[in-house]
């Protein structure tokens, strides 16, 4: 078949340009990425060969070979893994076939350092070769296809690439990098070995290079025909923890996740009992850009007796821990396990429970530590992954109490947007007579902290949690109490902030009686908007506020459902008015513009809690009319 020239997918062109300019300062990663791809290709061959051993083609010893040619100025990475067909080469090397691509490009800022971290999260893989090469040649043949169906793919990393069919006896893939003019320092056995040992020492396959020895007669290093293995070539998780350095754990994480940054923390142990498995689990430092994308691929790499089975085995982790990276190697599962079998397997259920408990323990160790560095780590974790962890309150009944202790919130105690207050912190600071944990929900911290509902709490020195994440209202339907203390919205039902003395009771009853006719008339004026109108003594500075009855949907949750395009019942709140406020005191049931004042008090309260007016034009018209009337009176 003749050579065919094709254009890169638009996103590939953009990624290549960004990557070459943003990642050059860390150019060594090209070799890590290409070796990682070669390792994946070997894993895939092992997996497919479980059903069809003929794919080994009498060459079962899998390996990766790295070589260089000073005269040609090339570096070559060769593997005898699964290889690619023509269609696979075009798809894998010419397009980015993954979710979240649009979100990724939308988050790029132009700041080289920040963009480099983001590109690392996205995963550059094969394209990293263009950081050091101005041309890349790939020759490959998929295992099981005839030698006549080899493929050559070549590109200068600009707008297009060429593909042609070739004769190739060996299965697998050979990638040749034609180096840029200023990259000659890479053409050294010592340099390449040092990069391999730095980034890929843990790769389970042997990485081979030709031995070099000093030739005294030539006064130079001479390449021998003999191979040497330049990495440890054993799966990191199978080694004893005492034999693994922190640096090796970090490098394995980067190999596993394609993240250029170090992990926040990790745990490594072997579990024995009903199910036997080894787990090496990492919590990243930063959330991936597509964490909240419905198609986000989460989960762990699953191995059975060191044989790779699948990426993203989401059955091993609950969705609220989808940020965790790592490896689980089972001794009990069958080698031909499928995703369908995983869903029904008792062994998998036991592994999932064990992995979940291990991750929660890892987070608890950070959250409960007296060490300042660990405290900072947990604060960083919460900032990145707190919203995701909160989902566990509704999804994981068995671990709900453990997750509740890990939650962090903003609070009137700290009066900052930082979410640093735990429920245990709140309970420890409760007033002697206080029986409930109070909270307010709002779209933003500013809206929460300025809520009229907080006025009486500030006056009495009672702490209120400020909940501003979209998931908060949902999780509170599952988290109704903590350590025997009910959670109570300050915008629901009647509040009991302590017993009143006889004098206070009598005074409030007297005021209620005085305002009874006015309140009845307000109910009539607002019958289409408000479920009820009543006096309140919870306000100190605001004339009015909206509350919902216990068990009814709040205005915040209704707005959230609407924003998500879901059906939400109509919102008919209770309007509470402050009899001590001048606006309420000045209301007269027989005044000509009484109805307008009632609607204004309702609309103001709605705006104060972050709600949207159904008819903004009428609100403006009504407000102007009332201002004009007051101006004329003056």
Curated annotation (Swiss-Prot):
Positions of region (B): 340-559
Subcellular location(s) of the protein: Cytoplasm
Paired cysteines (S-S): none
Predominant subcellular localization, coarse grouping: cytoplasm
Gene3D superfamilies per the UniProt record, alphabetical: 3.30.230.80, 3.40.50.11260, Heat shock protein 90, C-terminal domain, Histidine kinase-like ATPase, C-terminal domain
Family: Belongs to the heat shock protein 90 family.
UniProt region (C), positions on chain: 560-634
InterPro entries: HATPase_C_sf, Heat_shock_protein_90_CS, HSP90_C, Hsp90_fam, Hsp90_N, Ribosomal_Su5_D2-typ_SF
Species for this entry: Paraburkholderia xenovorans (strain LB400)
Protein name: Chaperone protein HtpG
Complex formation: Homodimer.
Stretch list, region A: 1-339
SUPFAM superfamilies: ATPase domain of HSP90 chaperone/DNA topoisomerase II/histidine kinase (SSF55874), HSP90 C-terminal domain (SSF110942), Ribosomal protein S5 domain 2-like (SSF54211)
Any GO molecular function: ATP-dependent protein folding chaperone
